[in-house]
């Protein structure tokens, strides 16, 4: 069995008492879970438009939480050219403590490299990969995704880690992603630069829809 917790931390304006309660909850959750992914709502302020209402901000925070769950599930359940199964996920996440998730999206020339780089420098990620113990890497694109591009994206992630990092990756082709490349990384055992390790959202891929996928607004910058 594998137990993964994905939680949000309060906005700063919600007060110190609520934050203290949340930190105590996260600490207790770490004792019961193999891995805990923490989403700091405060970081959302850096990527949301200033005109975003408070109600919409809380909805987005909740949606990020949902996307975090969906992202991990998709790594296992989405059929791929190079599959990532439950055993792979368990290898990376079992007993891993705190984890982060990053996602990058790109189109056009050099899209694979750009998507991988964006996954690493996402505004919701504030950490380095040099001390990572494990990385789950998912590369997705349309029917035009080439083996060369898969290699390019994987090389960006490998170069940001070390030879001791256990990297497991999968590659998926989805016709709705024509012209796009998405790179998702789930990283465990990473040294923090202060605060909880954050997670970036992954756009849900609904099997009921044939419409092209649109990335969240802050991924399109």
Residue ranges and their predicted role:
Residues 1-221:
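Tubulin/FtsZ superfamily GTPase core signature
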């Amino acid at each position: 069995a594998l137990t993964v917790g994905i939680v949000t931390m309060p906005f700063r304006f919600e007060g110190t008492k609520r934050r203290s309660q949340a930190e105590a909850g996260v600490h207790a959750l770490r004792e019961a879970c193999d891995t805990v992914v923490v989403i700091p709502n405060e970081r959302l302020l850096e990527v949301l438009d200033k005109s975003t209402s408070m109600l919409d901000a809380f909805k987005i925070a909740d949606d990020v939480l949902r996307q975090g769950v969906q992202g991990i599930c998709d790594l296992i359940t989405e059929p791929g050219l190079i599959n990532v199964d439950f055993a792979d996920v368990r290898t990376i996440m079992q007993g891993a403590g705190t984890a982060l998730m990053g996602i990058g999206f790109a189109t056009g020339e050099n899209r694979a490299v750009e998507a991988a780089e964006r996954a690493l420098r996402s505004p919701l990620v504030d950490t380095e990969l040099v001390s990572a113990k494990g990385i789950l890497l998912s590369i997705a694109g349309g029917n035009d995704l080439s083996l060369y591009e898969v290699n390019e994206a994987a090389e960006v992630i490998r170069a940001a880690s070390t030879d001791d990092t256990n990297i497991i990756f999968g590659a998926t082709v989805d016709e709705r992603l024509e012209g796009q490349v998405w790179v998702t990384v789930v990283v465990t055992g990473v040294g923090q630069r202060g605060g909880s390790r954050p997670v970036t959202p992954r756009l849900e891929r609904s099997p009921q829809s044939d419409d092209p996928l649109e990335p969240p607004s802050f991924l399109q910058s």
